[in-house]
Amino acid sequence: INPICAVERKMDLDELARCFAQGRQRFQREFERATDQGCRIYLLCENASWENLINGKYRSKVNANAFTASAMAWMVRYNMNVVFCKEETSGRLIREILYRDLKERLENGEYG
């Protein structure tokens, strides 16, 4: 069974920075597989914001400009939706994303 929707959750910008730096090849393969299967991808990052990413307000040594460029490039390359939130709301958001994605596909007749 191919996934139709995936939510990639990261606990903060430092974890996401590690994916773009040390684990980039593995992270890239995951996104390429999902994209090849027509999967919609949502990247949910807790305890973060675009402002924190752009301004380098995280512990990682990854350059803020490079980090921002990678995030933007992946949004375009993999048609990825980025969601920033507090950790208290991540469970609810994941549920809503999965529910709304499936509901939209059903209403559009993607399943019979």
Question: Where do the protein language model's features map onto the residues?
Answer:
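Non-catalytic C-terminal interaction segments of nucleic acid-processing enzymes
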Residues: 1-3, 14-112
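Conserved catalytic cores of phosphodiester-cleaving nucleases, focusing on short active-site segments
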Residues: 5-11
